């Protein structure tokens, strides 16, 4: 559950960066200053935000490929950032099984948007997973979610 809370905080920071033009450092400071997360979860939040921002161009290219009929800019900002974060975690931060990352992204979409957003996120991430050749599991130790 700590990683779920960390992902929600990371999403809030990514949303502030994307929509509000907030700097990544300021966005992280704002979401982490509430002190609701233990240090390990704060570290995970920071890794997700910094990693997603570092790989954003490559991740956005993946989203564009699979968001058939949608321009990236036309996607709901919350969905766009859920997809960015999940694709970062699936492709570059391979500590969690892909199926868990996808399920967490679906839950975030349903909680921060609606059921339809959850289905959209699920479809896009699953298509990307298959096409990118990502196994649903991970080869090395799973740190737990």
Curated annotation (Swiss-Prot):
Which species expresses this protein natively? Moorella thermoacetica (strain ATCC 39073 / JCM 9320)
Q: What does this protein do?
A: Involved in transcription antitermination. Required for transcription of ribosomal RNA (rRNA) genes. Binds specifically to the boxA antiterminator sequence of the ribosomal RNA (rrn) operons.
MF term (GO), any: RNA binding
A Pfam entry, by short name: NusB
Q: Which protein family is named in the record?
A: Belongs to the NusB family.
A biological process (GO) of this protein is: DNA-templated transcription termination
PANTHER family, alphabetized: ANTITERMINATION NUSB DOMAIN-CONTAINING PROTEIN, N UTILIZATION SUBSTANCE PROTEIN B-RELATED
The reply to whether Transcription figures as a keyword in the UniProt entry is yes
Q: Which CDD domains match?
A: Terminator_NusB (cd00619)
Record protein name field: Transcription antitermination protein NusB
Q: Output the HAMAP family linked to this UniProt entry.
A: NusB
Record keywords: RNA-binding, Transcription, Transcription antitermination, Transcription regulation
Gene Ontology cellular component annotations, sorted alphabetically: cytosol
